[in-house]
Every structure is written in C-alpha cells, then in structure tokens.
Amino acid sequence: MALSQMMQQYLEVKDKYKDALIFYRLGDFYEMFFDDAVTASKELDLTLTGRDCGLSERAPMCGVPYHAVDTYIAKLLAKGYKVVICEQMTKPGDQKGLVVRKVVREVTPGTRIDSVMLDGDKNNYLMSAYLSDDGKAGVSWTDISTGEFQNLLIDSQLNLKLNEILSRVSPAEIICNSKMKVRSNQLSLVRYGGIYKFSQYSDDAFSYDNAFEKVKAVLKNFSMFDGKPECVCSAGALLDYIEKTQKRTLKHIKSGEFDDAEQYMTIDANARRTLELMSSSGGKTSGSLIKIIDNTSTSMGARMLKKWLEKPSLDIGEINRRLDAV
C-alpha cells in the first residue's frame, strides 16, 4: 500500500522541519499526524484519533481549530517546542489535484510576536552566541516584538561572563555555532541548572563573510562592529535565523547597540537567586523584589523597571535621573 498524496505532501514538509511540530491546515483545523500528533495530544490534552493515510494502519492524528491556534502554540512554546505553520494556499475545488500548501512561519520560543503568546510585562529574548577559534565570544540578543538588538564581546573569563549574561538576559531561546555548543556544556547554568539549552545553528550562518553581509543589509549602524568580528558573526547569524523562521526581514529591527558592562553592576546567577530580584526562592514571581515594587502602568514601563533591576547602573547621573522620574 502507498501513502495518500496528501500524506506524502505532509511528510515532505516534516522532512524539512524534523525538530518542529507541524501544524498542517485542513479546512477549519490545523492537524498533526504520526509522532507530532502523539506529542501534541499529550502536551495539549487533545483527543488522539486516526486518519486513513494509505497504509495498513491509520495515522495517529489530533487537531486544533484555526481560530484558537495561537493559544495552543503558546502552550507548546512555553514547554520548549518549535511549531511550523503549513497553510493552505488554494481552496479545495479551486483547481484539480491536491490543495497547494506552504510553510508560512516557524514559531520558536524566541521568535513569538503575537500578543497571545507573550507576557507584555517582560521581554522575550532570542540569543545568538558565537565562539571563535581563539576563545573569544560574540553574543547578540534581540526581542523581535520590540526591535531591541544588543551585542556583547567576551574576551576573557568566558564561562563566568556567559553565565552572568544568561542569568541577566534570561533568553527564551539560544542558537550557537558548533564550537559554542561544545563549550556550553561547561556552563553551570546548563550542566546543573538545566535552565538553558544551546541549539546548534548552521555554521555557515556564523561565518564572518555571510554574517557581515547580513549585518550590513539590516543594521544601519553596522560600522559599530568594527574590530569586533566575533559580534559580527553572532549578530549576522541571529538576523539570518530571524529571516529564516519569519520568512521575511523584520523592518523594525534597524540598528543595534553594545552592552556596556562598565556602566552597570555585575551580579552573578547565585547572587540574583539569593536577592530574589525576579523570583522568590520557590521560583515564583510572588515574594520577589520586582513583584513588590512594580507599580508601573504600562507594559513598556514594566519592562524598563525589570531592566533597571537586572542591570543596576553605576553612573551617578543616570541614577539621579531615574530617581527624579519617580
């Protein structure tokens, strides 16, 4: 027995996105099949059914209504899954043969934009980390919902500073080159905390020539990367990943900044936990410092206050400006 044409089409998509759950549009539903269906039914508490697929056994299947899809995707992202949206491009009956379908978006923990999937009071960062042959690292991170794009060069105390930036930025997703993937296993927040996972991305995207072309095409102030090739590599790969997952260039990401570590107090991961800045000892927001002092009126204000707590300024002038604003 042979697979049906529709199921062949589905498996062609799945073959290109092996590490993601495929949401495959069928009429008013997004359906999942085979292993994806088993996983989604468990994680989303959906009924697992079956569908004739041309084989001797029915293909495991489950689905969600298209109008509520963002809610289900948000639940999967919160558990670390990636989701690929495969949309119908033609209507049944409009033409002979199989309905044309196309992947229109990849949604990952660090690339969510829709308000349903986001907590407006906190940033949702996607991070890129590159390790060079001589042990220097470029780290770039962005919140694609706001356009913020930060960069940092690490040329000493690599493990210590990587742990610090992870605990401060708290990225939802991290991509890296192959060398950084190996090195990440030495980080305490990876080995013992189990909090962060580095996902290896294409080394070609991290190559200097490819990364520089991407940075030059997107960031207006690309000259700020002069003398910092490691950051060119991390920033270029980050922009490449965004374009790949979103299937477009995000025009509101126009310029970048460098994270100036000399202007703020460095707080390591252990100190952050002890001080209970963002969460209490039980891992909950209630009882934390941010929960007690956050009386902001807007999501933008809440995000700003959170940054101020995570990066206490050492600049007297800046500290006084913040106090005067209260």
Predicted regions: what is each one?
Residues 1-326:
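Charged catalytic and DNA/RNA-contacting regions of genome-maintenance
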